[in-house]
Amino acid sequence: MKPTRNNVLTVSVLSLMLLGCGGDSSGDSSGSTVINGVTYKLTFKSDWNTTNFPTNYPSGSAHFSPLIGMTHNASASLFSTGKLATSGVEIVAEAGSTNSIKSEIGNIQNLGFSQSLIEGGDLPNGQTQVEVTFSLDEDFSLVSVITMVAPSPDWFVGVDSLNLFQNGQWVDELVVELKTYDAGTDDGVSFTSGNADTSPKENITLLTSAASDTDFSNGVHRSSGQHIGTFTFKRQ
């Protein structure tokens, strides 16, 4: 069950300005201290529910794992469609655990390609929004963050190498409509499928399934085009 390749994220730039505004947050990211940097609040809003995605929706257990990611430069990447998932991404996508990917990010930091770890809360069943703040500077202006669609075989949402410093300015606010990815590591076809390791592992793709298994095609609802949620990045 490996979807058609597509590496498009719908990104809407609401405004660009040199000065941002303040705000509060429900979570703080851990990582390196950023000197002369800027702070952003990431708000993850879920639109995954039985109304928008009714086919085999896992009522009572639908949730998202803790947000995990990093700020980095162009020499690093967390994931990419058309490429194999790292062990850390695989474990997030299959189990929601972040220990392995945090170790991978630590290795990237040791190479000098990542500045800060982004670590936020999960989104439990019945809740629709979670926030995390993080800092970055012009040398590490790219952001990558993922979270598991749970339960699922190996599905996740996120952004990779999103640039918050554009045309010499920090983006004031950026909304990303999230598509759902298949990590290529498990052959399960629906949210509650039993474990079935893919061998050999396949490349990350946008999630496409049979209409009887889920509503997803190319990462969004096959007929309505509904996205599973949004990431909003707002400068503080």
Descriptions of predicted regions:
Residues V11-M17:
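Bacterial N-terminal signal peptides
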Residues T33-T39, D47-V157:
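Structured domain cores in non-transmembrane regions
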